[in-house]
């Protein structure tokens, strides 16, 4: 007979079931209403007002790209069809215009470290907002930034925000495990870096099990 440690085991089992159910429900709704991608799109005029572009430049770029077979996002408004340009569409317009990206102008990554030992000071909200804003803000799109969020908090709140399917239950491919196993870049890309709903923003998840790394540190690294 298993011990339930004063009801803790039963509570944990129920919580795990509820979290899986909630995650599955969210995913089913997104599939049902075709909301599997990032929601934000831009009109052609909105793109024309972005840095280093103009109405003439955007119209010319779209014309050239469509003539070459490129397909832009569109939406139906009454009897007319209007451009609904995705983040990738805008990035491709900049590339067609030969606007240099951040990585063309700078060597290596730019690191932002968000940390506080105190809880409830908006570490997660700040991190996720920075990641989304630096990728998707109209004034930043010409940089075509590739964002990687490395979640080192065992609560996995940032992972939940960015990729809820990787935040429930025991997750083996976490940032803490990557450090413990001293993996190379190829292994990290293939096994640990997970895509999020926003193209260009990826995450290395955290898991509740990471909370035990500190207490087992000596045994793990011996």
Feature map (PLM): residue ranges:
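P-loop NTP-binding core
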Residues: 1-50, 63, 67-222
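Short coil turns linking two alpha-helices in DNA-binding domains
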Residues: 52-61
């Amino acid at each position: 007979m298993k011990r339930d440690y004063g009801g803790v085991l039963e509570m944990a089992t129920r919580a795990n079931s509820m979290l899986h159910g909630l995650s599955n429900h969210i995913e089913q709704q997104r599939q049902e209403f075709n909301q599997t991608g990032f929601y934000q799109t831009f009109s052609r005029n909105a793109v024309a007002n972005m840095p280093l572009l103009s109405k003439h430049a955007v119209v010319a770029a779209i014309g050239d790209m469509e003539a070459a077979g490129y397909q832009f996002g569109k939406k139906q408004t009454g009897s007319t069809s209007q451009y609904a340009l995705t983040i990738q569409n805008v990035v491709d317009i900049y590339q067609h215009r030969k606007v240099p990206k951040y990585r063309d102008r700078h060597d290596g990554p730019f690191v932002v470290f968000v940390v506080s030992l105190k809880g409830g000071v908006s570490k997660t909200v700040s991190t996720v907002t920075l990641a989304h804003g630096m990728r998707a803000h109209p004034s930043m799109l010409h940089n075509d930034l590739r964002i990687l969020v490395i979640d080192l908090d065992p609560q996995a709140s940032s992972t939940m925000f960015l990729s809820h399917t990787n935040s429930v239950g025991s997750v083996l491919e976490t940032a803490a495990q990557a450090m413990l196993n001293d993996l190379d870049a190829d292994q990290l890309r293939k096994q640990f870096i997970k895509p999020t709903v926003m193209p260009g923003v990826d995450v290395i998840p955290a898991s509740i099990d990471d909370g035990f790394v500190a207490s087992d540190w000596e045994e793990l690294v011996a």
